Amino acid sequence: MKKIILLGATGSIGTQTLAIIRENPEKFQLVALSFGRNMERGRAIIQEFKPKMVAVWHTRDRITLESEFPNVKFFNGLEGLREVATYLDGDVLLNAVMGSVGLLPTLDAIEAGKSIAIANKETLVTAGHIVMRAAREKNISLLPVDSEHSAILQALNGENPERIEKLVLTASGGSFRDKTRGELSEVTVKEALKHPNWNMGNKLTIDSATMFNKGLEVMEAHWLFGVDYDDIEVVIQRESIVHSMVQFVDGSFIAQLGTPDMRMPIQYALTYPDRLFIPYEKNFRITDFSALHFEKVDYERFPALKLAYNAGKIGGTMPTVLNAANEIAVAGFLNGQVAFYNIEALVENALNRHTSISEPDLDTILQVDQETRAYVKTLL
């Protein structure tokens, strides 16, 4: 029985994680969790799973819940996330919060000796050198929840990492993959949130449409697998059936295929190296797909991916700037303050004004993160 700590319980990844826990009560117990502002959904989760510790974001929500659930210990804010992440009775932390707020709870959980299932890619994007060093020192494995990195982990199972030629991350191309740059000036939030293949949260769906999401995943792959940026390739795979691939020095490829359902990589991160049966509404059959399509990325059409590669190669605090600027720009788009095509421009503006600080410590990363957010907000 694994005792699970789940950060971001009401989000897309959190909801699908709860489904796995619900379907496997003999294997998993949810002992602690966090959620943000969705009180209705949060209450239902507490009532069903009966966690011992819960963190919410606002003080008023904590006070309300304390009166409703006197047997549960409640916390709030970032400190609440950090308390829950290190809950003594938990075995595995699955960090599914969105944004750089997930960094400190992950580091705290590593220090506490928890196993880590990481869905919060910003943790590695902003502080990969710190997080991976801490994990090595504590002999903690970071198991990826992203479908692409889970696919690579599976493709590398039993292989010699020194024989890797390159990693190939696949991308659907997002909601606007068939639109020209000129056509993006008129797109709406509603249109942007219609992903062709995946069911994801709002921020992630927008990041998929710009391909900033894939850029963050390139950085994440760099840290998780120790592969240079020049040896990480992104290709468009429209069907989202091939989740990613590894090419080896002999020219061969190993790929992981499956239905576009996040329950698959979630359960693999929780049970690695074992697997669980997952009930699907429709069983996946490879014969349902008469063809699988692979396309080169047009970096003029998707400049966000080029910005991310450049930021990753420069390193230091540059990825932190890219991530923070993108979070504010996407929030501005979702709130109607920014046109879709201006998301990239805002991020590029923030990158151009920043001089990267190499090997930043945690305080420097957090300071640059806050300064970047404040700056981009002035541009909205």
Swiss-Prot record:
Catalytic activity as recorded in UniProt: 2-C-methyl-D-erythritol 4-phosphate + NADP(+) = 1-deoxy-D-xylulose 5-phosphate + NADPH + H(+)
Enzyme category, top tier: oxidoreductase
Pfam families, alphabetized: DXP_redisom_C (PF08436), DXP_reductoisom (PF02670), DXPR_C (PF13288)
Cofactors that this protein relies on: Mg(2+); Mn(2+)
Name of this protein: 1-deoxy-D-xylulose 5-phosphate reductoisomerase
Organism: Listeria welshimeri serovar 6b (strain ATCC 35897 / DSM 20650 / CCUG 15529 / CIP 8149 / NCTC 11857 / SLCC 5334 / V8)
Positions that bind Mn(2+): 146, 148, 217
InterPro entries attached to this UniProt entry: DXP_reductoisomerase, DXP_reductoisomerase_C, DXP_reductoisomerase_N, DXPR_C, DXPR_C_sf, NAD(P)-bd_dom_sf
GO biological process: isopentenyl diphosphate biosynthetic process, methylerythritol 4-phosphate pathway involved in terpenoid biosynthetic process
Physiological role: Catalyzes the NADPH-dependent rearrangement and reduction of 1-deoxy-D-xylulose-5-phosphate (DXP) to 2-C-methyl-D-erythritol 4-phosphate (MEP).
Gene3D superfamilies cross-referenced by the UniProt entry: 1.10.1740.10, NAD(P)-binding Rossmann-like Domain
EC number: 1.1.1.267
Annotated residues for binding of NADPH: 10-13, 36-38, 120, 122, 201
GO molecular function, one term: manganese ion binding
Pathway note: Isoprenoid biosynthesis; isopentenyl diphosphate biosynthesis via DXP pathway; isopentenyl diphosphate from 1-deoxy-D-xylulose 5-phosphate: step 1/6
Residues that bind 1-deoxy-D-xylulose 5-phosphate: 121, 147-148, 172, 195, 208, 213-214, 217
Family, per entry: Belongs to the DXR family.
Entry keyword set: Isoprene biosynthesis, Manganese, Metal-binding, NADP, Oxidoreductase
The keyword Oxidoreductase appears for this protein: yes
